From Swiss-Prot:
Gene Ontology CC annotations of this record: aggresome; centriolar satellite; cytosol; immunological synapse; plasma membrane
Catalytic activity: L-seryl-[protein] + ATP = O-phospho-L-seryl-[protein] + ADP + H(+); L-threonyl-[protein] + ATP = O-phospho-L-threonyl-[protein] + ADP + H(+)
Tissue specificity statement from the Swiss-Prot or TrEMBL entry: Expressed in skeletal muscle, T-cells, megakaryoblastic cells and platelets.
Name under which the protein is recorded: Protein kinase C theta type
Active site (UniProt): 504 (proton acceptor)
EC class (word): transferase
GO function term, MF aspect, one: diacylglycerol-dependent serine/threonine kinase activity
Chain positions found as Phosphotyrosine: 90
Result for mutant: residue 409 to A/E: Loss of kinase activity
Pfam families per UniProt: C1_1, PKC_C2, Pkinase, Pkinase_C
Role, per record: Calcium-independent, phospholipid- and diacylglycerol (DAG)-dependent serine/threonine-protein kinase that mediates non-redundant functions in T-cell receptor (TCR) signaling, including T-cells activation, proliferation, differentiation and survival, by mediating activation of multiple transcription factors such as NF-kappa-B, JUN, NFATC1 and NFATC2. In TCR-CD3/CD28-co-stimulated T-cells, is required for the activation of NF-kappa-B and JUN, which in turn are essential for IL2 production, and participates in the calcium-dependent NFATC1 and NFATC2 transactivation.
Location in or out of the cell: Cytoplasm; Cell membrane
Keyword set includes ATP-binding: yes
C-alpha cells in the first residue's frame, strides 16, 4: 500500500512584496520533494527526484513517507526568488484524512505572499507490496457510518405545500388560532405562503394558497365552483402588547408599526405576510370546514340510502337473465385489495376496525385460531441493544416460549408521527412481509404495537454488517467483493420485479448471516408501485450513494439503485468512497461532475463494471440497459446455484453462539436494553387509527407460537 497526495496550486498572491513591484513578474512555481536522512553531519533533507514545475491550476502526485517534505518555491521571469515555503507531506495527509480525504488551505509564504493549495488523498496498491503502517493509522475514507436523508413529505391541500416543521418560537395556528404545542416538529407550514397550522387542522384548510402558481391560474379560469373572495382591508397598526401574526403564527416584532390590522375583521399580520393572506375576511375557517364536512357526510349518507334502495328494488332499466336476477347478492363484500399478500394480519385492541360491514366466511375461517394470538413486548427478554437512532432502537431479544433469538426494531410513535413517517413505516412493513419470498432479504416474523411503540420482529443476523467488517480489513479482495455483489444483485432484481425501488443501498444495510451470505435490511426508504414507466422524484438516500438524477431533481425509477450499487462495489473493492467533499454541497457537486479515481491495480473487469454503473444518463446505466448478470466480472457465477445458497461464501464470520453480539459496534452493546420514553402528551392526543393496519404475523411465527 503506497498512499499518495494529488496536489494542486493556484491563486498566488504576492502581497506587498518589493520584488514584485514595477514590471509584470509572471510568477511560476518549482516543487522540490526532499527525503529525511541521517548522515555523518547529522540530520538533513536530500532531494532525490527532479524538480517539478507544475503549471498553475494543474495537479501533480506526491507519495507519502514519514519525514518527506515538499518545498515550494515561487520564482519570477526576471526575479530568482519571490517566496517559498515547506510542507510536511505526512501532516498534510493527516489533515486530508480528517476532512474525508480532501483539504484546501492557504499556504503562507516567506518572506511574503500566499497561495491556495488543494490536496486529495489516494491509495495505490501493487500486487507485491504488503499493507504498511498507513492502514493501521486510519488513512481511509470509510471510517464512520453515514445516515440517510429524506426530503420532507409534502401534503398538497388547496395548492398549499405543507411540510412538518419545527417552530423555534411560540406559534399560533392560522386555522383555529390556538397555540401549536410540542417539542419536535409541532405542526405544518406551507412552503409557498408560510401559513402555519396544527397537524390536526390540515383537513380544515379551505383557502387556496396565495403563493402557488397553480392557484393563480385556477383562480384566473374559475375552475372551482366553491370560491370565497373577501379581501381584507389592512392598515399599519401600533401594537401596545405582544401580538402574534394570524398567518405565519409568530410574534410581531418591534416597538412601533409592528404589523397590519384589518379594519373589518381585526386580523393581525406581519408586513411581509400581507400579500400571502387569503381573501377570507370575516370567515372562520374552522367553523366553515366543519359545516362543509357535515354537508358532505349528509350527501354520502343520502347516496348510500339511494344505493340500498336500488339494490332492494332491483334494476329497472336493464334487463338481466333470470339466473342472474335470482342470485342472492350479499349486502357487503370484503375488499380483496386490503388482504395481506401472505401470512395473517391480526389487529390489536388499538387497531379494531368497524365491523358493521363484516361478512362471516366460515369456510375460510374454520381453522384460524391464530387470529386470536396477540404478541406483546413482555413475551420477549431484551438482552442487548444492537443499535439506535432518532427513530428508536434495535434489540437482541429472546422469545420466552421457545428461547429463540430475534432482532426487534422498536420505533417511537411520537417520532414517527412528528417526522411524518407513518406511510414510510407502513411501506417498510409491507416490504418486509414480502421478503420471505427471497433468500437475500431480511425476513420478518411479525409486527405488533403498544400505545407508545411499533415493533418489528425480524430474524437475528449475527454476522454483522459490511461496514463493520470493512473497517477491520479496509477493503475486500476481488472474490469476496464479487460474491457479495452477485447476491446483492439477486436481491435488488427481486425488489425491482415487485415494483419496489430500494433507494438506500449502502454497506451499513447489508448484513451477514452466520454462514456468510448477505441479507439486505432496512426498507424504510423504499418506494412501491414502480412498475413499467412509473417514476418518482422524492429527494432521499445516503449522501455518498445518491444518484445524480436525484440531485438534479429529475424523475427517476430503479436506475438509482444501480448507481448506489456502483458506489457500494467501489467501496468494497478500493476501500474508499468514489466521490468526496468537505460538506454536502461539495459532495453533491462531485457526484454530478467528477469521474472516480481507479487505481492501477484494479482488475480490468471490475473497472469496466464500475464505469458502466457510473454512467450519468440513467437509461444507459448498466442494470437498466443490458443484463448485469452477463458482465465478465460474474462469468464464474452460477446464478441458479447462488440463489439456492449452494455456493459457499468466501468469508464466514466468527459466530460463537446464536446470541453472539461480537460482530456489532461496541458503543451500543454496553447500554442497558430498554425502551425510550415517549412524549405522553402527544401520545394521548394521537389518532391511533393511523397505525390500524400495522399488525402482521408470518406463518413462520405462527408455527412457533402454536
Amino acid at each position: 500500500m503506497s498512499p499518495f497526495l494529488r496536489i494542486g496550486l493556484s491563486n498566488f498572491d504576492c502581497g506587498s512584496c518589493q520584488s514584485c513591484q514595477g514590471e509584470a513578474v509572471n510568477p511560476y512555481c518549482a516543487v522540490l520533494v526532499k527525503e529525511y536522512v541521517e548522515s555523518e553531519n547529522g540530520q538533513m533533507y536530500i532531494q532525490k527526484k527532479p524538480t517539478m514545475y507544475p503549471p498553475w491550476d494543474s495537479t501533480f502526485d506526491a507519495h507519502i513517507n514519514k519525514g518527506r517534505v515538499m518545498q515550494i518555491i515561487v520564482k519570477g521571469k526576471n526575479v530568482d526568488l519571490i517566496s517559498e515555503t515547506t510542507v510536511e507531506l505526512y501532516s498534510l495527509a493527516e489533515r486530508c484524512r480528517k476532512n474525508n480525504g480532501k483539504t484546501e488551505i492557504w499556504l503562507e509564504l516567506k518572506p511574503q505572499g500566499r497561495m491556495l493549495m488543494n490536496a486529495r488523498y489516494f491509495l495505490e496498491m501493487s500486487d507485491t507490496k504488503d499493507m504498511n503502517e498507513f492502514e493501521t493509522e486510519g488513512f481511509f475514507a470509510l471510517h464512520q457510518r453515514r445516515g440517510a436523508i429524506k426530503q420532507a413529505k409534502v401534503h398538497h391541500v388547496k395548492c398549499h405545500e405543507f411540510t412538518a416543521t419545527f417552530f423555534p418560537q411560540p406559534t399560533f395556528c392560522s386555522v383555529c388560532h390556538e397555540f401549536v404545542w410540542g417539542l419536535n416538529k409541532q405542526g405544518y407550514q406551507c412552503r409557498q405562503c408560510n401559513a402555519a397550522i396544527h397537524k390536526k387542522c390540515i383537513d380544515k384548510v379551505i383557502a387556496k394558497c396565495t403563493g402557488s402558481a397553480i392557484n393563480s391560474r385556477e383562480t384566473m379560469f374559475h375552475k372551482e365552483r366553491f370560491k370565497i373572495d373577501m379581501p381584507h382591508r389592512f392598515k399599519v397598526y401600533n401594537y401596545k402588547s405582544p401580538t402574534f401574526c394570524e398567518h405565519c403564527g409568530t410574534l410581531l416584532w418591534g416597538l412601533a408599526r409592528q404589523g397590519l390590522k384589518c379594519d373589518a375583521c381585526g386580523m393581525n399580520v406581519h408586513h411581509r405576510c400581507q400579500t400571502k393572506v387569503a381573501n377570507l375576511c370575516g370567515i372562520n375557517q374552522k367553523l366553515m370546514a366543519e359545516a362543509l364536512a357535515m354537508i358532505e357526510s349528509t350527501q354520502q349518507a343520502r347516496c348510500l340510502r339511494d344505493t340500498e334502495q336500488i339494490f332492494r328494488e332491483g334494476p329497472v332499466e336493464i334487463g338481466l337473465p333470470c339466473s342472474i336476477k335470482n342470485e342472492a347478492r350479499p349486502p357487503c363484500l370484503p375488499t380483496p385489495g386490503k388482504r395481506e399478500p401472505q401470512g395473517i394480519s391480526w389487529e390489536s385492541p388499538l387497531d379494531e376496525v368497524d365491523k358493521m360491514c363484516h361478512l362471516p366466511e366460515p369456510e375460510l375461517n374454520k381453522e384460524r385460531p391464530s387470529l386470536q394470538i396477540k404478541l406483546k413486548i413482555e413475551d420477549f427478554i431484551l438482552h442487548k441493544m444492537l443499535g439506535k437512532g432518532s427513530f428508536g432502537k434495535v434489540f437482541l431479544a429472546e422469545f420466552k416460549k421457545t428461547n429463540q433469538f430475534f432482532a426487534i426494531k422498536a420505533l417511537k410513535k411520537d417520532v414517527v408521527l412528528m417526522d411524518d413517517d407513518v406511510e414510510c413505516t407502513m411501506v417498510e412493513k409491507r416490504v418486509l412481509s414480502l421478503a420471505w419470498e427471497h433468500p437475500f432479504l431480511t425476513h420478518m416474523f411479525c409486527t405488533f404495537q403498544t400505545k407508545e411503540n411499533l415493533f418489528f420482529v425480524m430474524e437475528y443476523l449475527n454476522g454483522g454488517d459490511l461496514m463493520y467488517h470493512i473497517q477491520s480489513c479496509h477493503k475486500f479482495d476481488l472474490s469476496r467483493a464479487t460474491f457479495y455483489a452477485a447476491e446483492i444483485i439477486l436481491g435488488l432484481q427481486f425488489l425491482h420485479s415487485k415494483g419496489i425501488v430500494y433507494r438506500d443501498l449502502k454497506l451499513d444495510n447489508i448484513l451477514l448471516d452466520k454462514d456468510g451470505h448477505i441479507k439486505i435490511a432496512d426498507f424504510g426508504m423504499c418506494k412501491e408501485n414502480m412498475l413499467g414507466d412509473a417514476k418518482t422524484n422524492t429527494f432521499c438516500g445516503t449522501p455518498d450513494y445518491i444518484a445524480p438524477e436525484i440531485l438534479l431533481g429529475q424523475k427517476y425509477n430503479h436506475s438509482v439503485d444501480w448507481w448506489s450499487f456502483g458506489v457500494l462495489l467501489y467501496e468494497m473493492l478500493i476501500g474508499q468512497s468514489p466521490f468526496h467533499g468537505q460538506d454536502e454541497e461539495e459532495l453533491f457537486h462531485s457526484i454530478r461532475m467528477d469521474n472516480p479515481f481507479y487505481p492501477r491495480w484494479l482488475e480490468k473487469e471490475a473497472k469496466d463494471l464500475l464505469v458502466k454503473l457510473f454512467v450519468r444518463e440513467p437509461e444507459k446505466r448498466l442494470g437498466v440497459r443490458g443484463d448485469i448478470r452477463q458482465h465478465p466480472l460474474f462469468r464464474e457465477i452460477n446464478w441458479e446455484e447462488l440463489e439456492r445458497k449452494e455456493i459457499d461464501p468466501p468469508f464466514r464470520p466468527k459466530v460463537k453462539s446464536p446470541f453472539d453480539c461480537s460482530n456489532f459496534d461496541k458503543e451500543f452493546l454496553n447500554e442497558k436494553p430498554r425502551l425510550s420514553f415517549a412524549d405522553r402528551a402527544l401520545i394521548n392526543s394521537m389518532d391511533q387509527n393511523m397505525f390500524r393496519n400495522f399488525s402482521f404475523m408470518n406463518p413462520g411465527m405462527e408455527r412457533l407460537i402454536s
